[in-house]
Amino acid sequence: KFYETIKLIRKNYPDCDVIINCTSSGDNRVSDDSPYGNAVRMLHHANVPGIEMGTFDAGTFNWGIPGGIFSNSPTFLTTLGNLYQERNIKPEFEVFDMGMIRAVGVYWKKGIVKAPLHFQLCLGVVGGLAATPADVQDMLAYIQRLQAEGNLPKEVTVSGFGIGKGHLPVMFSALANGCHIRK
């Protein structure tokens, strides 16, 4: 479906400058230990031309629903980061808590991902931070602290979204702090 969708966008709207961003998730049943492994989550990134950006969820987290553990092992993230570099795909670092921000810094210091970095603050998921302006502020302050310590590069952009009733508070807080937003 990714290939057909991208092909239709490029064919029917040749002047459209929309960024093609494809997920690396989509199936919480897949992990390093599953029969297909995590490779199935990267097939489109490896094979479909025209993908410019791809999600990189910087750790495992709990969706708060039955069967809702979303596995992003260091093995998977290292392979994904290397694939993105090979294919010139810009990672969108989806971060659901502070630990994921720090993890991105570790992958950056190891050379698995390169600056500039783009963070997507994903707030309101049960297993992550709440979707409040205070949590946006805390995450932005943590990014700045890691930058000051040399554990994140200076070249960083940030966007944010909140789930459900947190959508507008996160959106307005992100905008007020000079960030981008995702609808």
Regions found by a protein language model. Name each.
Residues 1, 54, 104, 174:
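Conserved, mostly hydrophobic/aromatic
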